[in-house]
């Protein structure tokens, strides 16, 4: 029974998900259906939380839109996600960046992780 569940979970998982973590700036392209038409909607922001649970993995992205903070939670292996692109790597020391909710402006900036040689 356990092997069947594991096999079904592996079958539903996507293989083209890039490596990213909290502090990284990502662009998530989401399929949106409006009146019979399907289009891609991009949501760009900072990953403030990531949860790794196999097929149930999820992550939360935060962005500032018109001066207002907007957060959106995504299931990593969801069929509505077309692609995930990592724009920049952030250097943080926490796994969950919920403290960014209380900050704005320069104090909400995240240092960039420089590539090692």
From Swiss-Prot:
The keyword Ribonucleoprotein applies. The keyword tRNA processing does not apply. Pfam families: Ribosomal_L19. GO terms for molecular function: structural constituent of ribosome. Keywords: Ribonucleoprotein, Ribosomal protein. This protein is located at the 30S-50S ribosomal subunit interface and may play a role in the structure and function of the aminoacyl-tRNA binding site. Belongs to the bacterial ribosomal protein bL19 family. This is Large ribosomal subunit protein bL19. It comes from Shewanella halifaxensis (strain HAW-EB4).
